[in-house]
């Protein structure tokens, strides 16, 4: 009995020391610090989307021979061809299949392109939701310009997805359940893209980089 009573204080002490080990992870930044001003909201919710345009991972990127958008829009035509040099550059028949149009739905690289396009579309939709959640940081002009810029980026990625895959879903929110997602007719997606770009064009800022 005494042993059990003695064990209780030890258990309480051990639990108190364990609570001292609770630390705020240094590799994570609270959302309140990420979105604490108009500038930080732009950097993290708008400008960050441009990082995905020039991505270099396989299956990602709009430019460069990264087995992504550029390759599937160029090496599938007479515009360019990658010849096999002996056993080199065969890569499991990847480039030949592109040129011959003999890819399948199970091809990893083509699947990565689909994932890449919709990753940016979902992130763009999430950015629009984030801007609305923190609209108190912005004046009306900033809010309109931020959202217009994101909508323009998203429309561009919808265009590439429609151009490559035809009937694609148009997402209503970043948290939309997979079971609720439906394909849209290609003509409807095209109209959606045009309407988005026409709506945001007057709201986009005139400033641009020199790159």
Predicted features along the sequence, with ranges:
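Short linear capping/connector segments at secondary-structure termini
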Residues: 30-31, 102, 172-178
């Amino acid at each position: 009995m005494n042993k059990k009573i003695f064990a209780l204080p030890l258990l309480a002490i051990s639990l108190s020391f364990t609570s001292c080990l609770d630390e705020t992870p240094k590799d994570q930044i609270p959302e309140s610090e990420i979105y604490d001003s108009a500038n930080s909201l732009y950097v993290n919710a708008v400008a960050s989307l441009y990082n995905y345009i020039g991505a270099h991972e396989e299956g990602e990127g709009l430019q460069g021979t990264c087995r992504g958008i550029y390759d599937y829009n160029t090496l599938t035509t007479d515009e360019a061809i990658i010849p096999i040099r002996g056993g080199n550059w065969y890569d499991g028949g990847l480039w030949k299949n592109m040129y011959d149009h003999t890819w399948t739905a199970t091809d990893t690289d083509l699947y990565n392109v689909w994932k890449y396009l919709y990753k940016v579309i979902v992130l763009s939709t999430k950015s629009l939701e984030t801007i609305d959640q923190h609209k108190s940081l912005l004046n009306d002009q900033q809010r309109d310009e931020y959202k217009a810029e994101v909508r323009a980026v998203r429309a561009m990625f919808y265009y590439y997805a429609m151009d490559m895959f035809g009937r694609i879903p148009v997402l209503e929110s970043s948290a939309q359940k997979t079971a609720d997602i439906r394909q849209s007719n290609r003509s409807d997606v095209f109209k959606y893209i045009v309407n988005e770009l026409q709506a945001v064009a007057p709201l986009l800022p005139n400033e641009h980089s020199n790159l």
